From Swiss-Prot:
Biased composition (Polar residues): 564-585
The organism's place on the tree of life at top rank: Eukaryota
Lineage, opening ranks: Eukaryota, Metazoa, Chordata, Craniata, Vertebrata
Major subcellular location class: cytoplasm
Binding-site positions, ATP: Y107, E108, S109, G244, C245
Enzyme Commission number(s): 2.7.7.19
GO biological process: histone mRNA catabolic process; mitochondrial RNA 3'-end processing; mRNA processing
GO terms assigned for molecular function: ATP binding; magnesium ion binding; manganese ion binding; poly(A) RNA polymerase activity; protein homodimerization activity; RNA binding; UTP binding
Protein name: Poly(A) RNA polymerase, mitochondrial
């Protein structure tokens, strides 16, 4: 369930952890989930992205390092439901009794909430020790101690007297009306793409909240599996997530039962007594079933819990009311996390990548090419891989192939998952930046031209090698899974949906071709450039563009028919140039 009226306000850290400022060019490139600029704060973000996208990447961290830092950050954090009339200074003074506060912000979901990060985990224990279980006259409370807390005022009148309410800023993506206004006032198509990216990308606060939600669910799962880890994956961590997207997470049990090599000495070998089941799938179903029951019965704020255990990938789906996220929990989904890391690498290499992906996804959503309901539609993941493939095909390439990333990997990068070679270099700083200087305006137009004329009937898309290959089967759209190479990630796409994509891509390429690049129509407040591409089907601009595009073809057809008829013995032409039908036998 998405949050209503979500808003956030960042507060500066007060701990003694000093952070160096970084150049604006770096913060532009890294202003995405899980990067250094994200951890430093939104103040370092720049509103303009360099045209070439070739930027210094020396300060970038590995995906695993970022996720580790985020997890540790979340473990020092609590989520507090606050009264609307809370006094912020008194609130922080109260919390400081338990230890110094490193960072905090407020947001609105189903009420007012505060995310508070302490400097030490022990501060949370102190806070919990001073927290009591509520008593109800008509209902019985289940005494489950978590880091999701509820703050009540002893004397509400003393809190509001002469004190301003806490400030919140809107964390929801802009409305369609606001987006078209922003895009129409931009000075170039390049600026439009970057404006859309800035409006939709995950904020620092939203990223913190996603990791905190995973950490809260981990506390519940740890009751049965003390060494488990709940890891976010997908759009929440791969730099391509947009505000309002679902939170995908998986239960990682790899740490459970691992040997401590320092204590594994002597002549004996100890094992846990465990239950055995016929297959790993059944084990996964049983584990998720139990976790689902725990979330439903004991998880504060977890509502609408559904156990979808017979799916190809068993999962538990639920809404987390405190954060406002719709959550999907799976188990031991390591390949999905590795795919997230690969997209993180690609999204961090060049600032044009994310801008192009966000715009293509938004375009697809505007024309109902993608859907939140499972079916025959193209997925956001497929669209992202198509953009990556297109950028690999540029001259010179903007993005390297997966095989080339594998070729520069070292022993530390080696990764085999479920028999699949998932090895690629994990350090972005080892990857040579591209010398390609093409603008986003050119790239988005040529993306639509490229796939509007792609031979989908015979070729497949392969980012591992970065070249077109013959399709191994008759699927309308074949995009090879980067790691499980025998699988097609777009197997669900129907022929009709692919045809719709191709037609819309051709229309969009034509619209961009007709734009007067030197004189954007921002002064007229009419949709142009990217904004024109996002107009819904049937709107004036799109309909007109299609009519204009089809008119020359219809004239050619009419001319061809006229030529055929003029050469027929059954027709002739009078002196006015009009055709007349002969009545002669």
């Amino acid at each position: 369930m998405a949050a209503r009226g979500v808003g956030l306000l960042t507060r500066l850290p007060v701990c003694s952890q000093r952070r160096n400022r970084i150049p604006r060019s770096i913060s532009r490139l890294l202003s995405c989930p899980g990067t250094i600029a994200a951890s430093i704060g939104s103040e370092e973000q720049s509103s303009v992205v360099a045209e070439t996208g070739i930027e210094d990447k020396t300060l970038q961290k590995k995906f695993s390092e970022v996720q580790k830092e985020r997890r540790e950050q979340a473990q020092r954090t609590v989520l507090i439901h606050c009264p609307n009339n809370i006094n912020e200074k008194k609130f922080l003074k109260y919390l400081s009794q338990h230890g110094p506060v490193n960072n905090h912000f407020f947001y609105e979901s189903f009420g007012l909430f505060a995310v508070v990060e302490f400097c030490q985990k022990d501060s949370i224990k102190s806070l919990q020790n001073g927290t009591h279980t509520p008593t109800q006259s008509t209902e019985a409370a289940i005494p489950f101690k978590s880091r999701f807390l509820n703050l009540r005022l002893k004397n509400p009148s003393s809190q509001v007297s002469g004190q301003p309410f806490v400030q919140t800023t809107n964390q929801s993506p802009p409305s369609s009306k606001k987006l078209f206004e922003l895009l129409s006032y931009a000075e170039s198509i390049e600026e439009q793409l970057n404006t859309l990216l800035k409006a939709f990308q995950l904020t620092e606060e939203n990223i913190r909240l996603r990791h905190l939600t995973c950490s809260l669910i981990e506390d519940i799962a740890a009751a049965y599996f003390p060494s488990c880890v709940i890891r976010p994956f997908g759009s929440s961590v791969n730099t391509f997530g947009k505000l309002g997207c679902d939170l995908d997470m998986f239960l990682d049990l790899d740490e459970t039962g691992k040997l401590d090599v320092h204590k594994n000495t002597g002549n004996f070998f100890m094992e846990f007594q465990v239950k055995n089941v016929p297959s790993e799938r059944i084990a996964t179903q049983k584990i998720l079933s139990v976790i689902g029951e725990c979330l439903d019965n004991f998880g504060p704020g977890c509502v609408g819990v559904q156990k979808i255990l017979n799916a190809r990938c068993p999962l538990v789906r639920f809404s987390h009311q405190g954060s406002g996220f719709q959550c999907d929990l799976t188990a031991n989904n390591s390949i999905a996390l590795k795919s997230s890391e690969l997209l993180y690498i690609y999204g961090s290499l060049d600032s044009r990548v994310r801008a192009l992906v966000f715009s293509v996804r938004c375009w697809a959503r505007a024309h109902s090419l993608t859907s939140s309901i499972p079916g025959a539609w193209i997925t956001n993941f497929s669209l992202t891989v198509m953009v990556i493939f297109f950028l690999q095909r540029r001259s010179p390439p903007i993005l390297p192939t997966l095989d080339s990333l594998k070729s520069i990997a070292d022993a530390e990068d080696r990764c085999i998952l479920e028999g699949n070679n998932c090895t690629f270099v994990q350090d972005v700083n080892k990857i040579q930046p591209s010398g390609n200087t093409e603008t986003l305006e050119l790239l988005i137009k040529e993306f639509f031209e490229y796939f509007g004329n792609f031979a989908f009937n015979k070729n497949s898309i392969n980012i591992r090698q970065g070249r077109e290959q013959n399709k191994p089967d008759s699927s309308p759209l074949y995009i090879q899974n980067p790691f499980e190479t025998s699988l097609n990630i777009s197997k669900n796409v129907s022929q009709s949906q692919l045809q719709k994509f191709v037609e819309l891509a051709r229309d969009s390429a034509w619209i961009l071709e007709q734009e007067d690049k030197n004189q954007p129509f921002s002064s007229s407040r009419q949709p142009w450039g990217l904004a024109a591409l996002l107009l819904p089907p049937g709107s004036g601009h799109t309909s007109l563009s299609r009519k204009k595009k089809k008119k020359p073809m219809s004239e050619k057809v009419k001319g061809l028919l006229a030529s055929i008829k003029s050469n027929s013995p059954d027709s002739s032409t009078d002196t006015s140039g009009k055709r007349t039908i002969s009545t002669q036998a």
